[in-house]
């Protein structure tokens, strides 16, 4: 039986997924295929490296620094989020909070990091083979928010946030051999995503990256359709959805320490359902054999 886990990210709301995955580390829950979109990709990296608690300060401490995200960055570097600071300065060996690359590489689990090709709008599914010591550009690509950030270029190809192309890569997980999938959302299940803001941003992006702009226009539909499908599969016992009952008033880039703490605590608490689901699935598997 192959078990997968997906963390869809969601900007600073991604601290919820960090809480879920920290609880998974505490319970020694292991997955065979780990898929991250946007901030979810960074959460997944720390989970695979076994670095409990590593991601939390990226949300509730570092994000308040001017170097991380600010109008100053937008004026000086033409990007509101300095992803080089996040995934380079802070995360490289010798940085303030380095990713344990060796531990990540040793992990037997597969890693998939989803980004959107800015030129053709298609999803790019990066793997461990695309990671190298102190070269974490695939995470930058997956987290690169269009319009407020310049695209992240890898091997001459510009990339934006993976949510533009495959915001909830559930079908990809099953197509790549998963029998059961845990899905971590950062919005309540019943909250239908609106496309109003995305359509406005798409208009601003249209002249330079028309395919990526179309991805923005379709993002809400793709997300809502995938979540609906996940609910159908959950009723069949094939998917376990972990989602907060509230966003605590947080949007993608809301910087509020109290709300961030609540979202992290919710993630750890809500992960109890995932623990039980995995235990039951493993039990059923052993009985079946």
Label for each model-derived stretch:
Residues 1-37, 45-289:
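Patatin-like phospholipase
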């Amino acid at each position: 039986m192959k078990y997968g886990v997906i963390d869809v990210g969601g900007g600073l709301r991604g601290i919820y997924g960090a809480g879920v995955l920290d609880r998974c580390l505490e319970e020694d829950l292991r997955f065979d295929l780990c898929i991250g979109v946007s901030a979810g990709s960074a959460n997944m990296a720390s989970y695979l490296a076994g670095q409990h608690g590593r991601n939390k300060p990226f949300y509730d401490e570092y994000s308040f620094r001017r170097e991380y995200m600010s109008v100053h960055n937008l004026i000086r570097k033409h990007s509101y989020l300095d992803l080089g600071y996040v995934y380079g300065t802070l995360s490289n060996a010798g940085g303030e909070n380095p990713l344990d690359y060796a531990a990540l590489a040793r992990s037997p689990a597969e890693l998939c990091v989803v980004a959107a090709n800015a030129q053709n709008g298609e999803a790019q599914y990066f793997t461990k083979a695309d990671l190298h010591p102190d070269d974490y550009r695939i995470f930058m690509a997956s987290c690169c928010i269009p319009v407020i950030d310049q695209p992240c270029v890898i091997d001459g190809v510009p990339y934006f946030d993976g949510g533009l192309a495959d915001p909830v890569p559930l079908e990809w997980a099953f197509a790549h051999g998963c029998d059961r999938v845990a899905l971590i959302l950062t919005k309540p299940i019943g909250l239908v995503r609106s496309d109003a803001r995305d359509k406005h941003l798409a208009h601003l992006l249209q002249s330079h990256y028309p395919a990526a702009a179309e991805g923005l226009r379709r993002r809400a539909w793709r997300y809502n359709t995938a979540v609906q499908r996940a609910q159908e599969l959950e009723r069949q016992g094939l998917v376990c959805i972990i989602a907060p009952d509230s966003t605590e008033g947080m949007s993608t880039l809301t910087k509020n320490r109290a709300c961030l703490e609540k979202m992290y605590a919710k993630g750890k608490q809500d992960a109890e359902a995932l623990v039980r689901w995995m235990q039951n699935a493993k039990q059923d598997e052993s009985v079946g054999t």
